[in-house]
C-alpha cells in the first residue's frame, strides 16, 4: 500500500567480554546479493532434547511456547523513498526498496529469481513450479551443518578473542563478518555449535537509536554495552527512522529476545521471540503515502506493548528471579578447580542429594507460579492492553508530527494499517486496524458436505494431479485439501458495508463521505494509524490545496480503533498466516490455506511464505499476460500496477510444520 520507503541503518554493539569503547566499528561487506526485491527468512526453535544445557532454552519446562517454526517472506512493488523527516541521507543515496536484519537465531536470504537460461525447474517431490532459488529453510535441509543459512539457533563459529568487537548476526546475504576456513570436520562444527549455545550469556534486544552517523557503506557500529552480573548485555538496533528514541525500560533489557525486522516497499515486518516470557510477537505494518508511519510503528509499538502487558503476562518478580538465576549461574561457571573438588566431595557426603531436592523444589515452585499465572490471565485485559498500546503509540506519533507540521505537512497524509499477533502458550491475541489479515488453517470437521467436496475435488483433479505426482510415494489422499480457513481479524475497508454505513452515519451532512469506494475519494481503508488529514481539519488544511479534501464538520472520517480477538489453540489448529492485504489481491483465505497445506505436504523442507509470494507473482504475471521474469523486470513503482508490497509470516502451530508425503 502506498508508494514510498525509507533508509536502513544498522547499529549494534560487540558481543565480547570487554566493555566497548565509545567509537564506531565499521566492517565492509563483500558483494552482497541483490536485496532490492525482497527477502525470505525463517526461525526454527531448537529441539530442547538436543541442546538441553542451553541457557537460552533451559527454562523450557517453565515457559510454554506453542509454535515451532516461523517462515516469512516479503516482496516490494514500490520504489524506495527517504523519510520526510530525514535531514540528510547517511548513505548518500537510497537504492534498496527491501532490507532485512535480525539476530543470529533467524536465517534469511534475499529473493533471487531463477535465471531464465536455467529452464523450467520443478520441486523434487511435487509439481510446483519454481520462480525463486531455495529459501533459508530449504537451504538448511539441503546443505547440512556447513551452510551458514542453516537451522542452528546461533552462529556456528565461536568468536575469536581478537574479534570480540564483532557481534555475529544473520545478514541477509548469508555471509559471516569474518571469513574463515570452511573445511572443518562435522564433529568440530557440532562441538563448536553446542559449546557456543551452552556458553551463550548475552541478552539482546532491539531498540531504536536516535543518532545516526555518516557512512558511505553498510556498516557495523558499536553503540552501547552494559555489564550486568559480570556479563555483557548487548543492546542492538536497526534504524528505519531518524527520529526515534531508546526505550529505557530496564525490564525490557533483562529479557532474552530474538528478533527480526525488515522492509519491502512500504511494508514493515517485526518479529520478536521472547524466551524470557515465552511469547511471540509479530507486527506487520502496511504503510501508505510515505514511510514515516510504518517506521514509527516498527520502532515504538513493541516497547509500548511490552510495558502495557506488565502485570498481565509478566511482572518484575519474574525479571528479578531471572537476574538472580543468571548471577548464580555465572558464579557456577566461574568456579575454580578447588570448588570442583569440593563438589565431588559433597557428592560422597550426600549433600548432592539435598541440592537435587532443593532444585526439584524450585522447579515445582516455578511451574506452580506459571500455572497460577496462566489461570489468572484475563484475556480481555490483555486485549485492552494491546489496544491501549496502539492508542498511546498513535498519540505520540501525531503529537510529534504536529510539531513538525509547518516543515513537513506531508506527514498528515502518511498512515499505516496495523496487524499485531501475540502468542503466549496456547493463547493467541490478535489486533488489527485496516485490511491486513490473520488467517488460521484448521482441520475441518468430518461432516458429509466436506466429504462430498473432497470427492468432487479428487475427481476434478484426478487427471492433472496424478500424472504429476507419480514420483511422490505414499498415501495420495493426503494431497486433497482438508483444512479450512478461519479469519481472526476484521477487514476495515470500504468493501465492508458495515464500515461504510458507520462513516456515513457519523457524517450525515456529507454526501461525499464515501465516494468511488474510498473514504472522501482518497483512502480504501476505513481505519488506520496516522493519516491525520482524515482525522482533524487542521491536518487537512496544512496540506497543499491539491491534496486537500472537502472536510465537512470536525468529526474524524477514519479512526484507529482496533478489532481485537483472542483464540485458544486446539488440536485442530495447524498453522497461522499473517499477511498484508497484498496477498489477498490474488488469493482468498481458503486458497491461501490450501496453498500452504499442499506445499508443506509436497515440499516438507521448503519455505511456505516464500512459496506464497512466488505463487502470487505467478498469478500477477499471468493476469497481465506475461511470464514471471518479465514481471520482475518491470521497475519498482511501475510494477505497483500489477501487485502490491506483500509481507507474509507463516507460523507452525502443531510443533512441526514439515512432514513428508513419502
From Swiss-Prot:
The EC number(s) this enzyme carries: 3.1.3.16
Transmembrane domains' residue ranges: none
The record's free-text note on cofactor binding: Binds 2 magnesium or manganese ions per subunit.
CDD domains in UniProt: PP2Cc
Disruption outcome: Plants show abnormal leaves altered in shape and curling.
Gene3D superfamilies associated with the record: PPM-type phosphatase domain
Cofactor requirements of the protein: Mg(2+); Mn(2+)
Expression sites by tissue: Expressed in seedlings, roots, leaves, stems, young inflorescences, flowers and siliques.
Sites where the protein binds Mn(2+) 2: 286, 581, 644
Binding site for Mn(2+) 1: 286-287
Alphabetical UniProt keywords: Developmental protein, Hydrolase, Magnesium, Manganese, Metal-binding, Nucleus, Phosphoprotein, Protein phosphatase
Function: Involved in leaf development regulation.
Note on domains (UniProt): The conserved PP2C phosphatase domain (250-651) is interrupted by an insertion of approximately 100 amino acids.
Protein name according to UniProt: Probable protein phosphatase 2C 4
Organismal lineage: Eukaryota, Viridiplantae, Streptophyta, Embryophyta, Tracheophyta
Gene name tied to this protein: PLL5
Amino acid at each position: 500500500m502506498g508508494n514510498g520507503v525509507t533508509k536502513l541503518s544498522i547499529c549494534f554493539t560487540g558481543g565480547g567480554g570487554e566493555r566497548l569503547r565509545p567509537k564506531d566499528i565499521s566492517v565492509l561487506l563483500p558483494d552482497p546479493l541483490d536485496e532490492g526485491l525482497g527477502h525470505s527468512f525463517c526461525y526454527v526453535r531448537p529441539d530442547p532434547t538436543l541442546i538441553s544445557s542451553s541457557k537460552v532454552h533451559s527454562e523450557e519446562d517453565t515457559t510454554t511456547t506453542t509454535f515451532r517454526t516461523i517462515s516469512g517472506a516479503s516482496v516490494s512493488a514500490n520504489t524506495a523513498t527517504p523519510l520526510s523527516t530525514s535531514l540528510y541521507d547517511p548513505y548518500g543515496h537510497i537504492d534498496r526498496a527491501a532490507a532485512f536484519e535480525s539476530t543470529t537465531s533467524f536465517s534469511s536470504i534475499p529473493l533471487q529469481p531463477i535465471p531464465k537460461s536455467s529452464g523450467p525447474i520443478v520441486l523434487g517431490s511435487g509439481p510446483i513450479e519454481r520462480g525463486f532459488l531455495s529459501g533459508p529453510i530449504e537451504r538448511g535441509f539441503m546443505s547440512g551443518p556447513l551452510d551458514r543459512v542453516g537451522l542452528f539457533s546461533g552462529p556456528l563459529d565461536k568468536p575469536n578473542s581478537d574479534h570480540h568487537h564483532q557481534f555475529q548476526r544473520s545478514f541477509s546475504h548469508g555471509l559471516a563478518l569474518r571469513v574463515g576456513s570452511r573445511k572443518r570436520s562435522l564433529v568440530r562444527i557440532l562441538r563448536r555449535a553446542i559449546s557456543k549455545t551452552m556458553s551463550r550469556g548475552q541478552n539482546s534486544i532491539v531498540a531504536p537509536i536516535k543518532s545516526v552517523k555518516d557512512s558511505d557503506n553498510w556498516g557495523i557500529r558499536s553503540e552501547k554495552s552494559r555489564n550486568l552480573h559480570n556479563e555483557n548485555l548487548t543492546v542492538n538496533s536497526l534504524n528505519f527512522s531518524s527520529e526515534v528514541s531508546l526505550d529505557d525500560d530496564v525490564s525490557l533489557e533483562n529479557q532474552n529476545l530474538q528478533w527480526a525486522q525488515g522492509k519491502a516497499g512500504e511494508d514493515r515486518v517485526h518479529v520478536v521471540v521472547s524466551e524470557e516470557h515465552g511469547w511471540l510477537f509479530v507486527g506487520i505494518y502496511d504503510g501508505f503515502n510515505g514511510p514515516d508511519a510504518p517506521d514509527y510503528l516498527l520502532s515504538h509499538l513493541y516497547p509500548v506493548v511490552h510495558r502495557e502487558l506488565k502485570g498481565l503476562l509478566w511482572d518484575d518478580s519474574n525479571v528479578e528471579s531471572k537476574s538472580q538465576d543468571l548471577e548464580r549461574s555465572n558464579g557456577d561457571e566461574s568456579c575454580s578447580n578447588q570448588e570442583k573438588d569440593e563438589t565431588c566431595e559433597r557428592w560422597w557426603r550426600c549433600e548432592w542429594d539435598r541440592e537435587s531436592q532443593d532444585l526439584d523444589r524450585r522447579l515445582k515452585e516455578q511451574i506452580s507460579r506459571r500455572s497460577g499465572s496462566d489461570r489468572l490471565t484475563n484475556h480481555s485485559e490483555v486485549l485492552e492492553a494491546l489496544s491501549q498500546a496502539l492508542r498511546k503509540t498513535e498519540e505520540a506519533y501525531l503529537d510529534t508530527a504536529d510539531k513538525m507540521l509547518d516543515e513537513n505537512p506531508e506527514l498528515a497524509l502518511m498512515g499505516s494499517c496495523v496487524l499485531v499477533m501475540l502468542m503466549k502458550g496456547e493463547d493467541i491475541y490478535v489486533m488489527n486496524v485496516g485490511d491486513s489479515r490473520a488467517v488460521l488453517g484448521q482441520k475441518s470437521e468430518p461432516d458429509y458436505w466436506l466429504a462430498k467436496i473432497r470427492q468432487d475435488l479428487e475427481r476434478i483433479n484426478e487427471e492433472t494431479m496424478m500424472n504429476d505426482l507419480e514420483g511422490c510415494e505414499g498415501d495420495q489422499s493426503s494431497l486433497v485439501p482438508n483444512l479450512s480457513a478461519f479469519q481472526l481479524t476484521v477487514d476495515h475497508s470500504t468493501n465492508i458495508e458495515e464500515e461504510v454505513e458507520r462513516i456515513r452515519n457519523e457524517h450525515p451532512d456529507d454526501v461525499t463521505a464515501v465516494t468511488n469506494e474510498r473514504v472522501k475519494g482518497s483512502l480504501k481503508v476505513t481505519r488506520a494509524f496516522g493519516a491525520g488529514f482524515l482525522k482533524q481539519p487542521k491536518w487537512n488544511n496544512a496540506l497543499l490545496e491539491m491534496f486537500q479534501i472537502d472536510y465537512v464538520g470536525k468529526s474524524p472520517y477514519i479512526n484507529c480503533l482496533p478489532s481485537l480477538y483472542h483464540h485458544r489453540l486446539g488440536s485442530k489448529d495447524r498453522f497461522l498466516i499473517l499477511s498484508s492485504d497484498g496477498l489477498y489481491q490474488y488469493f482468498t483465505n481458503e486458497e491461501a490455506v490450501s496453498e500452504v497445506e499442499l506445499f508443506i505436504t509436497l515440499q516438507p523442507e521448503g519455505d511456505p511464505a516464500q512459496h506464497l509470494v512466488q505463487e502470487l507473482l505467478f498469478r500477477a504475471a499471468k493476469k497481465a499476460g506475461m511470464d514471471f521474469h518479465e514481471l520482475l523486470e518491470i521497475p519498482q513503482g511501475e510494477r505497483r500496477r500489477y501487485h502490491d508490497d506483500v509481507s507474509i509470516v507463516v507460523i507452525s502451530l502443531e510443533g512441526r510444520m514439515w512432514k513428508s508425503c513419502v
